[in-house]
Amino acid sequence: QNQIEKFGQHFFKEGSMVIPGQIGYDPLYHAIELEDTFLGIPISEYLDKLVGKKIRGEISGVEATVVNHIVATKSERGHNTLYLKYSKSGNDFTTNVFNDGENLIASSDIEYGISRVIANNPFATTIALGAASIGSAATVQEGVYFVRGHFVKVNTQTVIVDQYTDTPSYRVGLFIDENIV
């Protein structure tokens, strides 16, 4: 380890990127807040299973892909929330976010535990007022950094900077947690 540390210190400053893990900021991290239950079932039971799924609004026809989520207990507003990348405007060609009080439909099955929501059936309803908003997020892609004499692999990570607004005033960085195994 001593040789690696000396080599690293010769070529890299503390905290330097060795293999670039691109750092990005997304000021348009679209959020949609959901009712707590759908057909009597808490949606928190399958919220995490929605990441990566394509969804659409039952009435609006707006389409999006789910990229992240937060459960109601972690939400500043107390609602289960999906973060989305919108891909298609509505049936009227002007609506570009899901409507308030609209049922959402997944294009593929949602499996959780021993249960399943079949594709093309509603799985959740947006809240009745102010369901759509824009948050912001920062992402670090997979890479390697030189930290405290070690080459440290960092996995892709996303942090929601502001849950429901796009005017953050934060500093984002990596936190190093050292453990002896």
What positions do the PLM features span?
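Subunit-assembly interface segments of extracellular/virion macromolecular structures
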Residues: 1-181
